[in-house]
């Protein structure tokens, strides 16, 4: 896996493990609802086709907390393309986690815009928030 992508994934996993999960879950579900209010969803869209980070976190806390770490690993593997640069892989990873990153920032008590900017500066990605 590309070094910059590994560093980005580990950074998010470490930040996630440092926050109170129940507070994070509430913030994530609120951010997701706000985001979903801005997306067009069709009747024939299948819920199972939605990525993990575009579904509300509703079930057992321990299960979801463990699943988030697994899904971050999985997503990093999915977005890694040998033909893409490190920066492009990180950009794809970032764009798939906009809601997750915003909820993480809110849970940490940081302005989401500042947190996104911090990621832009640290991992050389382009903010889309």
Swiss-Prot record:
InterPro entries: Mg296-like_C, MG296-like_sf, Mg296_protein. Gene3D superfamilies: mg296 homolog like, mpn423 like domain. It holds the Pfam family Mg296. SUPFAM superfamilies: MG296-like. This is Uncharacterized protein MG296.
């Amino acid at each position: 896996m590309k070094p910059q992508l590994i560093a980005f994934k580990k950074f998010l996993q470490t930040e996630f493990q440092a926050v109170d999960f129940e507070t994070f879950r509430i913030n994530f579900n609120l951010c997701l609802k706000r985001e979903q209010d801005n997306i067009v969803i069709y009747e024939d869209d299948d819920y199972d086709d939605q990525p993990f980070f575009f579904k509300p976190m509703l079930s057992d806390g321990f299960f979801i907390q463990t699943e988030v770490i697994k899904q971050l690993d999985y997503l990093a593997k999915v977005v890694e393309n040998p033909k893409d640069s490190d920066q492009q892989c990180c950009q794809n990873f970032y764009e798939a986690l906009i809601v997750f990153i915003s909820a993480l920032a809110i849970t940490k008590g940081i302005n989401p815009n500042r947190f996104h900017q911090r990621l832009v500066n640290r991992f050389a990605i382009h903010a889309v928030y």
